[in-house]
Structures are given as structure tokens and as C-alpha cells.
């Protein structure tokens, strides 16, 4: 998984993820799934803010790379990925400037157009379950929540998706590509349910110990753990072509 992450994500994102894990005392050599999850979350946050600006009239506009009129105010302030001390300094500055209510937990973004903090979620589970977990954690109606899944589903506070459909489609396509690349390397199932994989492996090992003294009998059945670890092959026809400006996983 670590090799996949380093090949799949921009070095800047990988470096930020490494710093984040180090800050919390986590070992990326051991917590490889968390390493991948942090990189994915960081990239979604960056993609969420990319190309979105506010013009002189206070309107939200999309400006592509290379546009000569790019000297505009960024619509989103990226908080995720910063050192915690710096991140809280940014949050306090935003609150003092805009009058926004200070969140109890560090959010991921601030939307200058809608004047609200945003919590971004990327889940391998059901979007509504993860949404409720985020809502219970933030405990603030003023923090906007937007959840994306690897299956193309999304859920947002009051069904307000903030971004235009095309911008959200880019994020969904990127997540689907990550899922497909993981599956092609046999990494997806363990990424989705690492606890279940560990539970099944422990169960199988315990069964092997109990049966070690019994006569050996060849079985054609597949171990439950191996079934879980089998790659989930995806239909490549469903993968849309990503824009050249966005990161892609290298082909095998």
C-alpha cells in the first residue's frame, strides 16, 4: 500500500500526509491504510478548492489554469494539511474577520462566498452513516458537511452541495480511479474493511492451531480471509477520462 500511495499521489500531498501522521505519533509503515486515507482526503480538499474564485462583484466563478484573469480572491481557504498551530491561527483569523462562529474541531475548508466552515469526508462506507458520525462530532449546525464515497455517492448538509456538478464529478472520478487502481493491485478490500480482514485472519490462525494435531485433509474451499482479500475488479468502461491538470495513478 505504501508503494501505491507514493506512486499514485503528488509528492506534496504525500509529504503533508507524512507530517500529519508524524504529528499524531503514527507510523505510516504500519498504518498504511491510514496513510492512503489521509492522502485521499487531502487531495479531495485541494480539488474542492481548485479553480474556484470570487470576482469583484462577490460572485463565485471558475477560472481554469493559465487564465490571465486569475488574480482573483480564492473562494476557499484550505485549512486541512496545515500544522495544527498554524491551522488554528488561520481559523481564529477567519472568525475575527468574518464573525463566523469558531468551531470546536479543526474544519477542512472555509467558504468565503457562503461564509461557512466546511468539513469534508471521504468514506469507504455508507455515506449517510459517515455523515451522521461527522455531524455528531462537529455538533455545530453552522459547519457545513460534505461527504464523498468511492462509489460516486455524496451527501451534504441540507442537500447543499456547494460546488457545481462538473467540479463534483471530477472529485468522484478521481475517487473511482483510486478505487480501481487499488483493486487492480489487490489492495481495495483490505482498505475498505481492514478490521474484518484482521478478524478473519486471526480466526483462521486459531483454527489452524486447533487442527494442527489432526490428520491433514486437502480442502478445495477458499479461506474466508482470502475471499475478503480477493481484488474487486471494476468495469473500466465506467471510468471517465480525467483532465490533464489532475493527478492520475500511473498505469501498471
Curated annotation (Swiss-Prot):
It is found in: Host cytoplasm; Host nucleus. This is Protein PA-X. Its main location: host cell. The record marks 28, 65, 202-203, 206 as: Important for efficient shutoff activity. The record marks 195, 198-199 as: Important for efficient shutoff activity and nuclear localization. The keyword Oxidoreductase does not apply. Plays a major role in the shutoff of the host protein expression by cleaving mRNAs probably via an endonuclease activity. This host shutoff allows the virus to escape from the host antiviral response. Hijacks host RNA splicing machinery to selectively target host RNAs containing introns for destruction. This may explain the preferential degradation of RNAs that have undergone co- or post-transcriptional processing. It comes from the Viruses. GO terms for biological process: viral RNA genome replication; viral translational frameshifting. The probable endonuclease active site in the N-terminus and the basic amino acid cluster in the C-terminus are important for the shutoff activity. The C-terminus acts as a nuclear localization signal. The C-terminus is recruited to host protein complexes involved in nuclear Pol II RNA processing. Belongs to the influenza viruses PA-X family. The lineage of its organism: Viruses, Riboviria, Orthornavirae, Negarnaviricota, Polyploviricotina. Keywords: Decay of host mRNAs by virus, Eukaryotic host gene expression shutoff by virus, Host cytoplasm, Host gene expression shutoff by virus, Host mRNA suppression by virus, Host nucleus, Host-virus interaction. The keyword Phosphoprotein does not apply. One of its GO terms (molecular function) is RNA binding. Pfam families: Flu_PA. The active site is at residues 80, 108.
